[in-house]
Amino acid sequence: MSTKLILSFSLCLMVLSCSAQLWPWQKGQGSRPHHGRQQHQFQHQCDIQRLTASEPSRRVRSEAGVTEIWDHDTPEFRCTGFVAVRVVIQPGGLLLPSYSNAPYITFVEQGRGVQGVVIPGCPETFQSDSEFEYPQSQRGRHSRQSESEEESSRGDQHQKIFRIREGDVIPSPAGVVQWTHNDGNDDLISVTLLDANSYHKQLDENVRSFFLAGQSQRETREEGSDRQSRESDDDEALLGANILSGFQDEILHELFRDVDRETISKLRGENDQRGFIVQAQDLKLRVPQDFEEEYERERGDRRRGQGGSGRSNGVEQGFCNLKFRRNFNTPTNTYVFNPRAGRINTVNSNSLPILEFLQLSAQHVVLYKNAIIGPRWNLNAHSALYVTRGEGRVQVVGDEGKSVFDDKVQRGQILVVPQGFAVVLKAGREGLEWVELKNSGNAITSPIGGRTSVLRAIPVEVLANSYDISTKEAYKLKNGRQEVEVFRPFQSRDEKERERFSIV
């Protein structure tokens, strides 16, 4: 009897242990651990009296591109835990494989290229330098190869690669290796937001990058200040270094026994002055189309189902097959559209499930000439607004009821808006476009005006007593705008008549 109890108890412990290890890969991250994010977030009180719209404060050049870093020691960056980086890859350039100790989300602002993702424990289901193996239904006249012939024709096998283009959102978990190649004719420009307050980051408040090749190039900041010397260590950790350069030659040679000493030296990045973005003009990659990627996922499932008991571990079936890309211009991503004012496109955990695990999301907002959005605030996230086109005016009001930002913004600037701070944006004569990167898998905004606003949900009598106005004025206040979040500019009666006449 006692033996059965001991066995049962041991089995329960084993099941609980396995469940604890696998829980991060499962869906439903609403109940996040408290010790991670809060530990870093509340080490100091944040008293934000002023926000700034800023451009990168440091540029590091490589052979085939530039890495630009925003000053993350300002109050708004430090308190929200955001770290922002912009990478410019020249045509033919290759951003070397690397990983970070913090999850991040990347927006492709310009260009096209190829992205690679390497997930530990997942199979190599992609092939290069060989004829692609299509499903039986698509082979047509192709004869069936024997197993040995198929093995010999596979060529190089690797994990998933996919094409990226302007408007794509690309997330990455902490510790997952990614690389990027620009095979287009224009510069490939991307902006990345790293979440330093994520519970995935275990060590301290610093974001660290780790490269698997190359050697960094150090350059001084474009703007000199006393504070820059104190920031040097943080920036160097963010820029990263080749982790193989720290291992001895003997260890690497023992590990990679089929390579010579010269290759070992190149693995360590010795005498490599190219930086972390290198020229790879001759690099040719066979990138699967969307239907081929779907087939590879199915093919990987079949492979894992063969042999042994025919079972797979569940983690491979879920995490290995997750998508790592979503384009803002996909019709299903349209959240709000106003033909006279603009539109809002959203990529969150509903459209890209991996964002539920990372607790990150993004919005793309397009405002037409003189159109307005807001005032509105984020219920459950901070946001970093990166302007991609045009210019406009932004006002942000904090918890003391005072303006903490009232200025114009333009292309290339980032404005960090903390959770709960109300923001309104008005486009200029050329319109205004921006991307909002947020630290929540399903960020929720609450508008003050419009058909879905908080004022619309409050009874007229409550509004009248709250603002000490008549019920008639309260009704007009509540129902004056029928649009949703994005508002067309105000027009006088004469302007409306001219518009009606021009349409006729």
Curated annotation (Swiss-Prot):
Coiled coil (residue ranges): none
Example GO molecular function: nutrient reservoir activity
Keywords recorded for this protein, A-Z: Disulfide bond, Seed storage protein, Signal, Storage protein
Database matches in Gene3D superfamilies: Jelly Rolls
Feature: compositional bias, Basic and acidic residues: 144-158, 218-231
Disulfide bond residue pairs: 46-79, 122-320
Pfam family membership, one: Cupin_1
Matching SUPFAM superfamilies: RmlC-like cupins (SSF51182)
Region spans: Disordered: 128-158, 214-237, 289-314
Keyword Signal: yes
Signal peptide positions on this chain: 1-20
Record function comment: Seed storage protein.
Family under the similarity heading: Belongs to the 11S seed storage protein (globulins) family.
Subunit-structure text: Hexamer; each subunit is composed of an acidic and a basic chain derived from a single precursor and linked by a disulfide bond.
Note: The sequence of the probable beta chain is highly homologous to the N-terminal sequence of BW24KD, a major buckwheat allergen.
Name this protein carries in UniProt: 13S globulin seed storage protein 2
Organism: Fagopyrum esculentum
Gene from which the chain derives: FA18
